[in-house]
């Protein structure tokens, strides 16, 4: 099958420093990541004619939004034929999907795509306390959007909302806390091999259960770690592929569908949510099957989300992710389906979806160092998002 996706490759990847409260601006971190990705792709700054980001500065959430595309365009003095940024779409991957669409349409040859967060610094300042609150004219702020149905009930966080989904999964399918723990323990085991990871100390099952409950059934280690950092990728037209001395990742397919009710707490299937629709759409756009995938980098803003994606993408049956990951053997680096090989957001840090893309490309190129999957992966699946917000990406080594 040949679709618009397969006209695109990921020719380069780059990251800034990643850490807790680095004290650097989002733009500063973005430029570091961008220049690294451009160099990795064998390009010059002048070759970049497209720019995409998520969510863009317009989201106006301190630490979360990152610099907008006009800021980066100005800082790098780019001459753009196309640019994009926005919050509403198939999760964080929408920036990559938009870039692939632009390349497929001939609007750009080389698109710089980036995601930048300074959440660790801003949370230390109390900078995200107002997220979801409307108003702004003084007095008592008013809730807006979907949060008007959650904040009055003191459900301030996605942890609260997604815990309900996890509880439903536990109830419907007999999923256990011991099974859920394997996502966090596997992530930490892989992070120990990643020099950029935030948390690298070993974690046992006893350590996991000793951590405090955040919102049942999620414990502290089920929740990802806020960080400061930026990740950039270069989406290039395959016909204009730069000459590089490493393999590149071809974009095989994207999954962007949303067919259920766009609600965190009123979705028609509370156990899979938007992952169900995005994953189903992904497999209609490729001749590849789940059995062809060698490594998976699945969103783990909360550990349960990786389980949702395993089911939605067809790596196990609906309701069977608990037994599938039990003991952690199948999802280990040397298992049948290595999962979140860099440590995921649980241990490597919340780079808000883009860390998974970066890691998938490194694995396909055989450049992941001590955490490299020994079998030499040829196909990787990447998934972002939770609740009604979801996007999936299939990459192959070219």
Question: Could you say what each language-model-derived stretch is?
Answer:
Residues 1-27, 36, 182, 213-277, ...:
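Condensing-enzyme catalytic core mediating Claisen C-C bond formation in acyl metabolism
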Residues 15-17, 55-59, 88-92, 115-121, ...:
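Acidic, glycine-rich active-site loops and adjacent beta-strand->loop/helix elements
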Residues 87-117, 159-193, 233-239, 348-368:
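Active-site-proximal alpha-helical scaffold in enzymes
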């Amino acid at each position: 099958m040949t679709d618009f996706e397969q006209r695109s490759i990921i020719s380069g990847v780059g990251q800034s420093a990643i850490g807790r409260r680095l004290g650097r601006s989002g733009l500063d971190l973005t430029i570091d990541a961008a220049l690294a990705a451009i160099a990795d792709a064998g390009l010059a700054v002048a070759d970049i004619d497209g720019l995409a980001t998520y969510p863009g500065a317009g989201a106006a959430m301190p630490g979360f939004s990152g610099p907008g595309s006009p800021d980066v365009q100005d800082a790098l003095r780019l001459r753009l034929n196309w640019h994009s940024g926005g919050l509403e779409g198939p999760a964080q991957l929408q920036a990559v999907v938009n870039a692939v669409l632009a390349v497929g349409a001939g609007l750009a040859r080389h698109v710089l795509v980036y995601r930048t967060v300074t959440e660790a610094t801003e949370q230390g300042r109390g900078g995200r306390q107002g997220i979801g609150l409307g108003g702004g004219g003084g007095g008592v702020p008013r809730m807006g959007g979907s949060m008007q149905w959650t904040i009055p009930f003191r459900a301030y966080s996605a942890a609260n909302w997604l815990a309900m989904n996890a509880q439903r999964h536990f109830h419907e399918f007999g999923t256990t806390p011991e099974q859920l723990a394997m996502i966090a323990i596997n992530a930490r085991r892989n992070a120990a091999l990643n020099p950029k990871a935030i948390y690298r100390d070993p974690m046992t099952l006893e350590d996991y259960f000793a951590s405090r409950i955040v919102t049942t059934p999620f414990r502290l280690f089920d929740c990802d770690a806020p960080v400061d950092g930026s990740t950039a990728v270069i989406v290039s037209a395959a016909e204009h592929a730069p000459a590089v001395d490493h393999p590149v990742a071809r974009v095989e397919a994207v999954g962007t569908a949303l067919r259920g009710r766009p609600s965190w707490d009123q979705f028609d299937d509370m156990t899979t949510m938007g992952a169900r629709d995005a994953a189903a759409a992904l497999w209609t756009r490729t001749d590849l099957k789940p059995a062809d995938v060698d490594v998976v980098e699945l969103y783990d803003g909360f550990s349960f989300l990786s389980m949702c994606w395993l089911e939605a993408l067809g790596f196990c049956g609906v309701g069977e992710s608990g037994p599938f990951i039990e003991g952690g053997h199948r999802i280990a680096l040397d298992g049948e389906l290595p999962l979140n090989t860099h440590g995921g957001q649980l241990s490597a840090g919340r780079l808000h979806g883009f860390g998974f893309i970066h890691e998938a490309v490194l694995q396909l190129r055989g450049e992941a160092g001590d955490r490299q999957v020994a079998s030499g992966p040829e196909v990787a699946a990447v998934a972002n998002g939770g609740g009604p917000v979801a996007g999936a990406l299939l990459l192959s080594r070219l």
